[in-house]
Regions:
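Canonical positions in the second alpha-helix
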Residues: 4-5, 38-39, 73
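Structural marker of alpha-solenoid helical repeat scaffolds
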Residues: 8, 42, 76-80
Length: 97
């Protein structure tokens, strides 16, 4: 279903994010990370994709990349005024040290 939506509109943030989440749930981390990255490439203000990409990277032990995703996500939060997500992501940054 999501693939069909993306065939019609490859920039659909919700569908692409959903596909990334499905890959992550299946343990397909590389595929999930690719889809999170594509989501933010097409939709740079789609904050959830940054946060979930960072969480996926943390699970994979890729802390430096997770920090970079969180920093990009914090910039998106600032652009969109998403204080709640910014607070959560800032907490993640602090936990990473």
């Amino acid at each position: 279903m999501l693939s069909g939506i993306l065939e019609q509109n490859p920039k659909d943030a919700f569908a692409r994010y959903g596909l990334a989440m499905a890959f992550a749930a299946e343990g397909k981390m590389d595929e999930a990370l690719r889809e999170f990255a594509t989501t933010t490439e097409y939709n740079p203000d789609y904050v959830p994709a940054y946060q979930m990409a960072a969480q996926t990277l943390i699970k994979a032990g890729r802390m430096d990349e997770a920090r970079a995703r969180l920093q990009a996500g914090l910039a998106a939060c600032e652009r969109t005024g998403n204080a709640h997500a910014a607070s959560e992501m800032q907490g993640m940054v602090e936990e990473l040290g």
